[in-house]
């Protein structure tokens, strides 16, 4: 079963911006309680959406470049990219159903 991929500042452009499939980037930190709450949800969804959508994780403690460039001020923040452009953003922990709804909308975009 697919899992979220780890992304660092050094490979963000390659793994996220140049991806052929939409990418949901989870900006998180190990000390963040809500981040730990949504981690198993994102693990599950990574498997269910494998091949159609990629879920990536960026540890903001270790990778500040893109978090800063994208104006990430609170975590968890999920930023959704399609064709190298930001098409959506969610700040804070949300229920699994909301993630599914948003991921499905992104996949339905032309």
From Swiss-Prot:
It comes from the Bacteria. PROSITE patterns: THIOREDOXIN_1, THIOREDOXIN_2. GO terms for molecular function: protein-disulfide reductase activity. The modification N6,N6-dimethyllysine is found at residue 105. Transmembrane segments: none annotated. Disulfide bonds join 32-35. Keywords: Disulfide bond, Electron transport, Methylation, Redox-active center, Transport. The keyword Signal does not apply. Pfam families: Thioredoxin (PF00085). One of its GO terms (cellular component) is cytoplasm. Residues 3-108 form the Thioredoxin domain. Coiled coil: none annotated. InterPro entries: Thioredoxin, Thioredoxin-like_sf, Thioredoxin_CS, Thioredoxin_domain. The keyword Transport applies. Belongs to the thioredoxin family. Participates in various redox reactions through the reversible oxidation of its active center dithiol to a disulfide and catalyzes dithiol-disulfide exchange reactions. This is Thioredoxin. It comes from Chloroflexus aurantiacus (strain ATCC 29366 / DSM 635 / J-10-fl). The lineage of its organism: Bacteria, Bacillati, Chloroflexota, Chloroflexia, Chloroflexales.
